[in-house]
C-alpha cells in the first residue's frame, strides 16, 4: 500500500534496458512479446503496479489500481500498446490499491481472483479497515495539509511550483476516492485456474496464505514469468493481514516454479530468487524479535520501534534503520494470539 510519493520516487529511477512506452499516467515496460509491466508516471495517484498480458483476441490485466480514475487512465494509456479489448482482470489480492478500479471493468471483462477476495470485499468493510484506513483516510489528508504548509514556507518559485503540483495530484486523488464502489470478482477459484489467451497459457495459482488469506500468483510457464502482487515484492510489503509462518512456506512454493522474471505489485521486476530467500529471512527474524519483545510485555507500538532488521538492508534498501510498520507488528501480535487458540 504505497503512497503517491513512493510512486513518484519509483518513476524517477533509471529504466531497465527493456523498451518503455510512456503514457500520461502509466509507462509500459516490455518484458517480452505481449507482456508489459505498467508503473506510474507520477501524474496521478495510481496504486499498485499492473501487468498487461496480450493474447490473440484480448488482454488480461493484473490488478486495477487505487481508484476508478486510475483504472480509466490505465485503459486509455493501454491503447498505446494494443487495440485489443480487456477480456480478463485478475486481482492478486483484496487490498484497495489492487482492486478499487474493479468497477470500471465490471460487466465488460471477467474479474477473477481467489475465493477469499470475494469474501473480503463483500464482508470486511474494506473502505473502513486497514490498509485503506491509514493509507487513504488518514495519510492523504495529512499529506495535503503538510503540502499546504510547505507551499506557504517555500523560499523560491521553483520549489513552490513543484509543491503545488504535488498538492494538485494529492487533492485530485482524494476526490477520486469518493467514486469508489468496492466491486468483488465475478469469477473465483480455490487452488488453480488456467486461462488460454490464444497461444498463451496463463495459470492462476493459490500457493498458500501469506500476504493475505487469498494471494494469487499469475504464472506464464512458457515465458517463465510470475506476477506476484504483494506476496513477493522487491521491497518490504505491508503486513497488516499477514499469515507469517505460512507466508514463508508459500514463498518456498513460489521458488519451485520455473520462472526467470518476477513482476511484483510494488517495486521493480527482479530475476534473482535469492531476493525471495532474503524476504523469508526477514519474516523469520521479525517473528523471532516480535516474540521476544512480546514475552517482555512490550506493546506492539514500542516493539515496532525496537525491532532491528537492518541486516536485510542490502536486499531491501528502503530499510534505513531499526523499526517496522506498526500495523505489521500489531498483526504479528494478533497472529501469535491466534496460534494459542
Language model regions located:
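Divalent-metal (often Zn2+) His-rich catalytic cores of metallo-beta-lactamase-fold enzymes
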Residues: 110, 245-298, 302
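Conserved beta-strand hairpin/beta-sheet module of binuclear metal-dependent hydrolase folds
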Residues: 29-77, 216-230
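Metallo-beta-lactamase
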Residues: 19, 23, 29-30, 122-206, ...
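Active-site metal-binding motif and surrounding structural segment of the metallo-beta-lactamase
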Residues: 56-59, 68-113, 255-257
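Active-site metal-binding loops of divalent metal-dependent hydrolases
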Residues: 41, 64-66, 94, 116, ...
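Active-site-proximal loop/helix segments of hydrolase catalytic cores
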Residues: 201-257
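C-terminal regulatory/interaction regions
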Residues: 295-341
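Sec-dependent N-terminal signal peptides
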Residues: 4-12
Amino acid at each position: 500500500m504505497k503512497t503517491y510519493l513512493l510512486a513518484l520516487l519509483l518513476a524517477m529511477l533509471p529504466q531497465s534496458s527493456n523498451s518503455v512506452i510512456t503514457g500520461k499516467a502509466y509507462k509500459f515496460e516490455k518484458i517480452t512479446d505481449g507482456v508489459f509491466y505498467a508503473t506510474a508516471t507520477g501524474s496521478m495517484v495510481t496504486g499498485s503496479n499492473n501487468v498487461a498480458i496480450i493474447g490473440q483476441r484480448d488482454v488480461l490485466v493484473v490488478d486495477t489500481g487505487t481508484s476508478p480514475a486510475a483504472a480509466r487512465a490505465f485503459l486509455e494509456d493501454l491503447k498505446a500498446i494494443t487495440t485489443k479489448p480487456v477480456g480478463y482482470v485478475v486481482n492478486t489480492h483484496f487490498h484497495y490499491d489492487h482492486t478499487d478500479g474493479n468497477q470500471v471493468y465490471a460487466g465488460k471483462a471477467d474479474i477473477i481472483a481467489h475465493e477469499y477476495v470475494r469474501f473480503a470485499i463483500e464482508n470486511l468493510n474494506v473502505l473502513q479497515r486497514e490498509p485503506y484506513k491509514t493509507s487513504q483516510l488518514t495519510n492523504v489528508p495529512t499529506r495535503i495539509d503538510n503540502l499546504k504548509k510547505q507551499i506557504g514556507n517555500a523560499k523560491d518559485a521553483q520549489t513552490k511550483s513543484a509543491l503545488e503540483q504535488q498538492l494538485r495530484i494529492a487533492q485530485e486523488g482524494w476526490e477520486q476516492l469518493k467514486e469508489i464502489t468496492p466491486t468483488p470478482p465475478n469469477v473465483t477459484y480455490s487452488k488453480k485456474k488456467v486461462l488460454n489467451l490464444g497461444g498463451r497459457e496463463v495459470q492462476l495459482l493459490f500457493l498458500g496464505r501469506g500476504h493475505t488469506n487469498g494471494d494469487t500468483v499469475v504464472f506464464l510457464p512458457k515465458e517463465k514469468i510470475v506476477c506476484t502482487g504483494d506476496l513477493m515484492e522487491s521491497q518490504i510489503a505491508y503486513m497488516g493481514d499477514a499469515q507469517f509462518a505460512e507466508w514463508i512456506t508459500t514463498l518456498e512454493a513460489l521458488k519451485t516454479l520455473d520462472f526467470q522474471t518476477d513482476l511484483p505489485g510494488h517495486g521493480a521486476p527482479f530475476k534473482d530468487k535469492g531476493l525471495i530467500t532474503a524476504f523469508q529471512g526477514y519474516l523469520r527474524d521479525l517473528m523471532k524479535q516480535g516474540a521476544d519483545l512480546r514475552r517482555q510485555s512490550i506493546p506492539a507500538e514500542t516493539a515496532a520501534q525496537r525491532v532491528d532488521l537492518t541486516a536485510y538492508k542490502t536486499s531491501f534498501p528502503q530499510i534505513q534503520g531499526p523499526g517496522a510498520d506498526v500495523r505489521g507488528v500489531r498483526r504479528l501480535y494478533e497472529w501469535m494470539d491466534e496460534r494459542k487458540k
